[in-house]
UniProtKB/Swiss-Prot annotation:
It comes from Listeria welshimeri serovar 6b (strain ATCC 35897 / DSM 20650 / CCUG 15529 / CIP 8149 / NCTC 11857 / SLCC 5334 / V8). Keywords: Cytoplasm, GTP-binding, Ligase, Magnesium, Metal-binding, Nucleotide-binding, Purine biosynthesis. This is Adenylosuccinate synthetase. It is found in: Cytoplasm. Binds 1 Mg(2+) ion per subunit. SUPFAM superfamilies: P-loop containing nucleoside triphosphate hydrolases. It is an enzyme of class 6 (ligase). Plays an important role in the de novo pathway of purine nucleotide biosynthesis. Catalyzes the first committed step in the biosynthesis of AMP from IMP. The lineage of its organism: Bacteria, Bacillati, Bacillota, Bacilli, Bacillales. InterPro entries: Adenylosuccin_syn_GTP-bd (IPR018220), Adenylosuccin_syn_Lys_AS (IPR033128), Adenylosuccinate_synth_dom1 (IPR042109), Adenylosuccinate_synth_dom2 (IPR042110), Adenylosuccinate_synth_dom3 (IPR042111), Adenylosuccinate_synthetase (IPR001114), P-loop_NTPase (IPR027417).
Amino acid sequence: MSSVVVVGTQWGDEGKGKITDFLSENAEAIARYQGGNNAGHTIKFDGETYKLHLIPSGIFYKEKISVIGNGMVVDPKALVEELKYLHDKGVDTSNLRISNRAHIILPYHIRIDEADEERKGANKIGTTKKGIGPAYMDKAARVGIRIIDLLDKETFKEKLEHNLGEKNRLLERFYELEGFKLEDILEEYYGYGQQFKDYVCDTSVVLNDALDDGKRVLFEGAQGVMLDIDQGTYPFVTSSNPIAGGVTIGSGVGPSKINHVVGVAKAYTTRVGDGPFPTELFDSIGDNIREVGREYGTTTGRPRRVGWFDSVVVRHARRVSGLTDLSLTLLDVLTGIETLKICVAYKLDGKTITEFPASLKDLARCEPVYEELPGWTEDITEVKSLDDLPVNCRHYMERIAQLTGVQVSMFSVGPDRAQTHVVKSVWRLA
């Protein structure tokens, strides 16, 4: 038995999909455990580029099981569209398994999400407006509708009818928007459920059986630690737990069955949406990183905010997710920058702090303390191993490992699978 969790160590968009896809080659099951179609990941497979939002990266390997876990919130319409997208490209999806306990996103969740973000104005969170937050709110309030409910028309109708009474009052009286009629949703969404019902099962059983049979299971996180609802920059966070601890809740696999946690970090830092960002760059270097790194959101197309590597952030990720390994991505984007900076601490009211503050008010006042390192000019996109990297690039990686306290076990120097390199296997048993 061997299991590996892949988590983002920053604010998402670290390249988790690429690393998950790479590690999937040696896995026999791949599972997502939180989030929904608010997070996109781009995967290159057999020369083709795919953009997925719900379905795990392992879907391209027909001999491997791909799991949408119970901790996810699933938009049935988006799922059907994503399945069609894959089928149109000739991808076999018969290896997909969808948890019967996962909650679903309905049109009223999306409308409420949009309206609430609009109402907040300058205080908006920066949500993707996909209905994720409202769906998780219903789950916590115990009025959510699960996939198992969607597949039973009578149960679905009963729960939907009950919820629409409350949601329509909220939409019409508070947001002054039009509500929904039962028939507007019932037939359409029941129909979506019927299109994917053959994939639905108890995925906790599937995953535990795989582990008990000695198979390798890979757990794929969405977003990143800094977007975790408990450990992130609250309230500028997602509505679930991307940290490694979220695996046990969102997949139905106990913590004793988790072996390694791989934190994926960009060689710099990016963020989409609002909230404090201590190392953010507003100069030509930041603009250059954004363009070379193609830093635009997979889901929204929004330009990402760009900054220097922040070891305070990744140390926080190491502690709250129990990172055993680090995968450093997009090193090639930094090529040609004469002097690189790494944030080693913050200055807050004249004092040096090395741990990430809980208070956003404090974080907004933090000034980064930088350490400068010489950059490199050599093209590194064709390197085949760690030893092939320029000395300055290796020193940069080594310093990141020292500052974060996590060994760099993988690194990537480009978007293709062949540009990801292993320093130490994360599938090791010890």
